[in-house]
Each structure stands twice: as structure tokens, then as C-alpha cells.
């Protein structure tokens, strides 16, 4: 062949030389005849040129016996390869034979057919030998067939390299009817595998057996499995294996999943599922085709997750949330999210939040710490939402909705307790916090505030507590107070905080008034008394009715002078003194030294009486009541505070006729007062005492304390039962006005409206959650007042009356 190619090349070179010579001749003619062409020459057609290739030689004819001779050598080479022996001729020599035969299409076709027969014959004999020597042990069998497959592929690689020219010419030219040498080997191998004693079935079953052993914890030869799976894929029978593999996987995890879900706890089951998912993922990567992934994972999802979702959540969800098991909850979320069951988590999430929250609200023993407990509860849920549930939007909304639901199952109490909680943080006497810590607590409190529907209840109690903090100088920081007001304004608008802001303005204005008053000549006679007076706008403050009391002469004179001063500058205004919110700092002489006592005005009045009593002298309850003018319940509360074990400024003495049990009034009073007796100078637990009207009292001159400034337990800063009741009554009254105004406003616009529609609009309009029965009562009252009337034809329709 090379000889022929060289001849062609030489001929081509000669042709090129001839052409070049011709070109040179043409150039010479042109150079010699530079005259312009005449008309006769221009009209004569040019002579035809003939291309002549000199020294052209034909391909020599192959000898008659060349085909048989070449095939014998090629066949012998194939046999040597199949026998794992060296060939007598080099690969290059064998390749040349194939190349020479392929120049003739008939010889090429004959060559292809002979190769096909020899390949088929060898594979058939090999597979038959495998059947005769086949082991019943699946692993040994797999090793045997893998060895044959490896030999086959190695042999076919060598055979293909010899007959590569045949592949590139004859096979490509007849690709619709013949296979490549490599595909020919695969075809015969696959056919024999299927036809010989169901060898294909045994191969698939043995592979499934090995995979099952691995799933049960045994070690297997993964390279062996990978090789055989690749064999099935190459032979186009992987799909058959895949079908059986999925069936086997389904059976395996059906049984194992049912067993595990009943045997182990939910966290362990979730761990088991994750491990199985990882194992199957690794199995896919190591020896399975990626086309199997979707079906395989669908089986695991169905058998290990979807079928057991309800059991998983019922058995373990609450326990995992209670135990703050973030990692396990994260696994739960990932697994259920992968099968589209987030809604099931949402249902369990909502149920847990509501049930736990309602239990917390109903635990009366922990009412004092309820708000802090709720904040801790919310923090825990937020942590789960963030770290375990990836801040899923559906679960985030479910948390908000559930928290709002349970916190409003008790309409007024949570709102009151949130206000009380904020009061405890802004009031002197609580745990000291940095500005950052206080800001954090206030922000968290606002989260609960947002959930509360009865914001008017919060407003009422917050205003009550704020008034005491401002008037009794119990606020830790005015800046913190104003910051809280600003937060409330952002949440609810200016209307909500208008009166709260006015309270601060009253305090600031009062300071200016007092500075002016102290500089006036009217106070020259009162230099021994340092008094601070707050002038409050009655509409802005939660002012209770004044409590009657007989004040010392100095106090009355000071009040009278201030009255004249203020009214002289504010003509037409009147002042009403709120003595119940006043407090004093007294200097008291005891045997062990002087002390400063911080007490309420009413306690001051009581202590003043003992200035006129000789040492060791006593005053009866009735004497004190007559001289102070205080009502009996009020007097009992203040005496109890002065006699408590934390202060012991006064010593209580029981008469022989005193009852061991108190009346209802005394019991309520003592309970309230004993609860307020905190923060005094002396240590020890507060003893619950009862003040009887037959008791006598004497000044404790032996009182001792390491502190110079003594804060006598005062009931002023605490909300009394009466004040609490009054606040709730005011809330109810305000709500009635709001409902009436809303009804009139709606009906004035609509003129005519059905009962259900009116109720619906009221619920959406009001800031609190009213009961339908209460709304119905207000409608009836407005009908009586002739703001509304029933439609003559339908009693469930209301008409507005101008």
C-alpha cells in the first residue's frame, strides 16, 4: 500500500512540474507578444487545453490467495489474543493486512463476516464453560463472570486496534446494517448471557444479594459490584437490573422502616433515616448509575419518611422541642421538607406553641414570673426556628399566629402583666441592668405587646405604673422611660401615647413652677421644709379620688401658700391635693443613732403622733385613727407596713381581747400590705400580721440597721386590690364608650346594616377583641337611646336615626 501511495505522490509531483512548466511557457508567450490583439484574433476562440499526468501507474492487483493468506494470519492472531498468548506478527503488520483487504469492498465485507463468526464462537464457548463451572455461591459466581467480562473487554480492545481500519471504512460506510467491532462483542456477550441457563437472571440476583448484604452491615467488594454494573450498562440490560433493584429496595425498607419506627425513639429514628439516605447516596456514587437516583430516593422517602410522618411527629415532636434538641429538629425539618410535608410540621408546631402557652397562662403559681417565662419561651422558639427550621416562612408565620392566639385566651391579664413587667424593669429597686440590657428587655417586651389584642388594658396599667414611677421618683432612668414611650408610639401611633407624653410635660412644667415658687418671697417662712409639688393635668393622669387625712399644721400651711402662689398665676384653675401619692423623708432619732426614713405621707402622719408621746408611751389604734383622720382600711395598711419585720419602726401590741382571726376587711388588708412589705432595712422573712382595732402601738427606739437611709416598705408603689379593680372598671367603661362611638360612626355612614355585618365591622375596627354578647348589649342600649332602630320588616337589620 505504501508503494502505491508513493507512486501517486510521484505522479502528483510530476503533474505539478508539468503545470508549472506550462505556466512558464504561457508567460514566455505573453512576454514575446506584447502587441495588442487585432479584431481577427479577438474573434477566434481559444484552443482547448488538455491536462496530461505523466508516469501514472495503476495499483497492483493483489494475489489470488492474498485474502485467505491474510485471514489465516489474522484469525491466528485473534485466537492468540483470546488464549492470552503473543501473536506471531506485530500489530502494525496485522493492521496493514486489514488495511489492504479494505481497499476491496467485497474483501472488507468478507473480513467483517469472518471476524463476527470468530468473535461469536469464542464468546459462546466461554459462556458455556462458565455455565458448566458456575458456583452456587453468589459472590464466587460474580467474581467468575467479572473475570470473564474483564478478559472479554481486554481482548476486544486488542482486536479492535487490529481491525480499526475496518471500523473506520467499511463499518462507517455500512453503519445502518453492521455494528462496530466493539459493539459486535457486546452484542454476542449480552445474547449469550441471556440465553445460557438464564445467566442474566442469576447475575442480577447475585448483585442484589451483595447489595442486601451491604445494607445489613456486611462488607462487600464494591469494585466488583461497580465493574458488573458497568457490564450490565454496556450490555444494555442495566434497566432490567434497575427494575429489580428498586423492587428489592422497596421490600427491604418497607420491612426495616416499620420495624425501626416502633422500636426506637424518634430522634434515633431520624438519625437512622439520615444514615440510610447517606448510605444509599454513597451507593449511587460508588457503583450505581445516576439514572437510578430519582427512583431510589423516592423509595426511601416513601418507605422511611412519608409513611411514618404522623407517628414521627406524634411520638417525638413535643419531646424534641421541650428538650431543645436543635440538631434532631433540624433533621426532622430537612427530611419532611424533602418530601413536601412542611404543613405537617406546621400543625405540630402550632399545637405545641398553643398548648404550652395556655398551660403557662393557667399556672397561677408562676404568675409573678409569667412574662419573663413567656419571653424565654419565645426566645427558645425563635432559636428553633432559626437554627433548626431555616427560618421557614410558613413556620415563622405559624409561630406568630399561635403566640397571638394563646396569649389572648385570657383577654386582660397578659396585657396587665406585660405592663407590670415593664414597670419592674423601669422602676428603682429591681435588678440593676446596663443600658444595653434594659434596651434588649424592653424590645423583647414589645414583642409580647404586639401579640396582645387588648392594648387599651396595657395602656391603662402602664399609665398607672408610670404615674407612680414619676411621682414617687422611682424611675431608674428618664431616658429609658422616654425611649419606651417612643417605642410604643412607633407601634401604636401618636394617639396611643399622647397622654403618656403629656405626663412627662406635666413633670417638667412642675419643676419650673417649683423653681419659681422657691424663689418667691412666699416661702421665706418654710425654709426648714423641703417640699416638691407636682401640678398634674387631671385628664392625663390616672388619678384616684382623694383620700381624706388630717395633715400636720406645717403641711397644711405649705399647701395653702402654694395654692395662693399658683392661682395668682393661673386664674380660673383649681387644685385638688392627692395626698395618697405623696412621700416624705424623715429624720428619726434612735438609741443607736440617727436615721433617714423614706415613708409615705400617711405613714409620716402616723409617726408624727409619736413626737408628742413620752419614751415608751403607747398609742391605741383608735387614738391614731382619730388624730390622722384616715379611714380604717387605709390606716391598717400603713400601720402594717410600719410594723412589718423588715422595718419594725413601730411595735404592735395585742390586747387580751384581740381576736386571733381577722375579719374579712383585716384579712384582705393584711394580705395586700404584707405583700407590699419588701425592700426594708432589716433581713428576715416578712411575717404576716393582722392589725386589729384593739391593738396599741409604741415607737421602737431600739430600732437598728447598718444603713443610714431606710426605705420603709410602702404600699404606694404597689397596685392595691382596690386600685386594680378601679383600673379594670375604667377599662370596661372606656371600652363601652369606644364601642358606642364605633357603632354610631359605622351606622352614620351605612345608614342601614344587618346585625352580622355590623358585628363584623366592629370586630375589625376596635383595638380590643370584644365579645359578641357585649356588642349586642351596646346595640340594645343605643336603640333605647334612639341612636338606632330595628327595621320594621326585619328585626336583624338596623337603621340609623339622625
Swiss-Prot record:
SUPFAM superfamilies this protein is in? Cullin homology domain, Cullin repeat-like, Winged helix' DNA-binding domain
Q: Name one GO biological process term.
A: DNA damage response
Alphabetically, the GO molecular function entries are:
ubiquitin protein ligase binding
Q: What does the entry list under GO cellular component?
A: Cul4-RING E3 ubiquitin ligase complex; nucleus
Q: Which UniProt keywords apply?
A: Isopeptide bond, Ubl conjugation, Ubl conjugation pathway
State the pathway, as annotated in the record: Protein modification; protein ubiquitination
> Which SMART domains does the annotation name?
CULLIN (SM00182), Cullin_Nedd8 (SM00884)
Taking every annotated instance into account, which residue ranges of this chain make up the domain Cullin neddylation?
734-794
Q: Which Pfam families match?
A: Cullin, Cullin_Nedd8
- Glycyl lysine isopeptide (Lys-Gly) (interchain with G-Cter in NEDD8) crosslink location in chain: 748
- Composition-biased stretches (Low complexity): 1-33, 656-676
* InterPro entries with a match to the protein in the record: Cullin (IPR045093), Cullin_CS (IPR016157), Cullin_homology (IPR016158), Cullin_homology_sf (IPR036317), Cullin_N (IPR001373), Cullin_neddylation_domain (IPR019559), Cullin_repeat-like_dom_sf (IPR016159), WH-like_DNA-bd_sf (IPR036388)
Region Disordered: start-end pairs: 1-43, 656-686
Q: Which domain of life is it from?
A: Eukaryota
Modification(s) after translation: Neddylated. Deneddylated via its interaction with the COP9 signalosome (CSN) complex.
Homology family: Belongs to the cullin family.
Q: What does this protein do?
A: Probable core component of cullin-based SCF-like E3 ubiquitin-protein ligase complexes which mediate the ubiquitination and subsequent proteasomal degradation of target proteins. The E3 ubiquitin-protein ligase activity of the complex is dependent on the neddylation of the cullin subunit.
Q: What is this protein called?
A: Cullin-4
Amino acid at each position: 500500500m505504501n508503494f502505491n501511495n508513493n507512486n501517486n505522490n510521484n505522479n502528483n509531483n510530476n503533474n505539478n512540474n508539468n503545470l508549472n512548466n506550462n505556466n512558464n511557457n504561457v508567460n514566455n508567450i505573453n512576454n514575446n507578444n506584447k502587441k495588442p490583439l487585432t479584431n481577427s484574433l479577438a474573434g477566434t476562440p481559444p484552443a482547448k487545453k488538455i491536462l496530461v499526468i505523466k508516469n501514472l501507474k495503476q495499483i497492483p492487483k493483489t494475489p489470488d490467495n492474498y485474502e485467505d493468506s491474510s485471514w489465516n494470519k489474522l484469525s491466528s492472531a485473534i485466537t492468540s489474543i483470546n488464549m492470552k498468548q503473543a501473536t506471531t506478527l506485530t500489530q502494525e503488520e496485522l493492521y496493514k493486512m486489514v488495511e489492504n483487504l479494505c481497499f476491496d469492498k467485497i474483501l472488507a465485507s468478507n473480513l467483517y463476516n469472518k471476524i463476527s463468526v470468530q468473535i461469536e464462537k469464542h464468546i459462546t464457548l466461554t459462556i458455556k464453560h462458565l455455565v458448566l463451572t458456575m458456583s452456587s455461591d453468589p459472590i464466587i459466581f460474580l467474581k467468575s463472570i467479572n473475570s470473564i467480562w474483564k478478559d472479554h473487554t481486554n481482548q476486544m480492545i486488542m482486536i479492535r486496534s487490529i481491525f480499526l481500519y475496518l471500523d473506520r471504512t467499511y463499518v462507517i460506510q455500512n453503519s445502518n446494517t453492521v455494528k462496530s467491532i466493539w459493539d459486535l462483542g457486546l452484542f454476542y456477550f449480552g445474547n449469550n448471557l441471556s440465553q445460557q441457563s438464564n445467566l442474566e437472571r442469576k447475575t442480577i440476583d447475585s448483585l442484589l444479594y451483595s447489595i442486601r448484604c451491604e445494607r445489613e452491615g456486611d462488607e462487600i467488594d464494591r469494585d466488583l459490584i461497580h465493574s458488573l454494573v458497568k457490564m450490565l450498562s454496556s450490555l444494555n440490560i442495566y434497566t432490567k437490573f434497575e427494575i429489580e433493584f428498586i423492587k428489592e429496595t422497596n421490600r427491604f425498607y418497607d420491612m426495616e422502616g416499620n420495624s425501626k419506627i416502633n422500636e426506637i425513639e424518634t430522634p434515633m429514628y431520624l438519625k437512622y433515616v439520615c444514615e440510610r439516605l447517606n448510605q444509599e447516596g454513597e451507593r449511587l456514587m460508588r457503583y450505581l448509575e445516576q439514572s437510578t437516583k430519582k427512583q431510589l430516593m423516592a423509595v426511601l422517602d416513601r418507605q422511611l419518611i412519608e409513611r411514618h410522618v404522623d407517628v414521627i411527629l406524634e411520638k417525638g415532636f413535643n419531646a424534641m422541642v421541650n428538650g431543645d434538641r436543635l440538631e434532631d429538629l433540624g433533621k426532622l425539618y430537612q427530611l419532611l421538607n424533602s418530601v413536601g410535608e412542611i404543613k405537617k410540621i406546621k400543625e405540630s408546631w402550632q399545637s405545641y406553641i398553643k398548648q404550652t402557652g395556655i398551660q403557662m397562662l393557667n399556672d397561677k403559681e408562676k404568675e409573678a414570673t409569667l412574662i419573663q417565662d413567656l419571653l424565654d419561651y419565645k426566645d427558645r422558639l425563635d432559636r428553633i426556628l432559626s437554627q433548626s427550621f431555616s427560618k421557614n416562612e410558613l413556620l415563622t408565620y405559624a409561630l406568630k399566629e399561635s403566640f397571638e392566639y394563646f396569649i389572648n385566651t385570657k383577654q386582660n391579664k397578659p396585657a396587665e402583666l406585660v405592663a407590670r413587667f415593664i414597670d419592674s424593669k423601669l422602676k428603682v429597686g429591681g435588678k440593676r441592668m446596663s443600658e444595653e440590657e434594659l434596651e434588649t428587655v424592653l424590645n423583647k417586651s414589645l414583642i409580647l405587646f404586639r401579640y396582645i389584642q387588648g392594648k387599651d388594658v396595657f395602656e391603662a396599667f402602664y399609665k398607672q405604673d408610670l404615674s407612680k414611677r414619676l411621682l414617687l421618683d422611682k424611675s431608674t432612668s428618664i431616658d429609658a422611660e422616654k425611649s419606651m414611650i417612643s417605642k410604643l408610639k412607633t407601634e401604636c401611633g401618636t394617639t396611643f401615647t399622647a397622654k403618656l407624653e403629656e405626663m412627662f410635660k406635666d413633670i417638667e412644667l412642675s419643676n419650673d413652677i417649683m423653681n419659681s415658687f422657691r424663689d418667691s418671697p412666699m416661702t421665706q417662712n418654710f425654709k426648714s421644709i423641703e417640699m416638691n409639688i407636682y401640678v398634674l393635668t387631671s385628664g392625663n393622669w390616672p388619678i384616684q379620688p382623694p383620700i381624706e387625712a388630717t395633715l400636720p399644721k406645717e403641711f397644711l400651711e405649705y399647701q395653702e401658700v402654694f395654692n395662693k402662689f399658683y392661682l395668682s398665676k393661673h386664674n380660673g384653675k383649681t387644685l385638688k391635693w392627692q395626698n395618697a401619692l405623696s412621700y416624705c423623708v424623715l429624720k428619726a432619732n434612735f438609741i443607736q443613732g440617727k436615721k433617714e426614713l423614706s415613708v409615705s405621707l400617711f405613714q409620716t402622719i402616723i409617726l408624727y403622733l409619736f413626737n408628742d408621746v413620752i419614751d415608751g408611751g403607747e398609742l391605741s389604734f383608735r387614738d391614731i385613727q382619730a388624730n390622722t383622720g384616715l379611714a380604717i382600711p387605709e390606716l391598717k395598711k400603713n400601720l402594717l407596713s410600719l410594723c412589718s419585720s423588715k422595718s419594725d419602726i413601730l411595735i404592735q401590741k395585742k390586747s387580751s381581747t384581740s381576736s386571733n382571726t381577722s375579719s374579712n376587711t383585716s384579712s384582705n388588708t393584711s394580705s395586700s400590705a404584707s405583700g407590699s412589705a419588701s425592700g426594708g432595712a432589716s433581713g428576715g422573712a416578712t411575717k404576716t400580721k393582722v392589725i386589729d382595732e384593739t391593738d396599741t402601738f409604741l415607737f421602737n427606739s431600739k430600732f437598728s440597721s447598718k444603713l443610714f437611709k431606710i426605705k420603709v416598705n410602702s404600699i404606694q408603689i404597689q397596685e392595691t386590690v382596690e386600685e386594680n379593680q378601679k383600673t379594670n372598671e375604667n377599662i370596661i367603661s372606656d371600652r363601652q364608650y369606644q364601642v358606642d362611638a364605633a357603632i354610631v360612626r359605622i351606622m352614620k355612614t351605612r345608614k342601614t346594616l344587618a346585625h352580622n355585618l355590623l358585628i363584623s365591622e366592629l370586630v375589625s375596627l376596635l383595638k380590643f377583641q370584644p365579645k359578641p354578647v357585649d356588642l349586642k348589649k351596646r346595640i340594645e342600649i343605643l336603640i333605647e337611646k334612639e341612636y338606632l332602630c330595628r327595621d320594621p320588616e326585619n328585626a336583624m337589620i338596623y337603621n340609623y336615626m339622625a
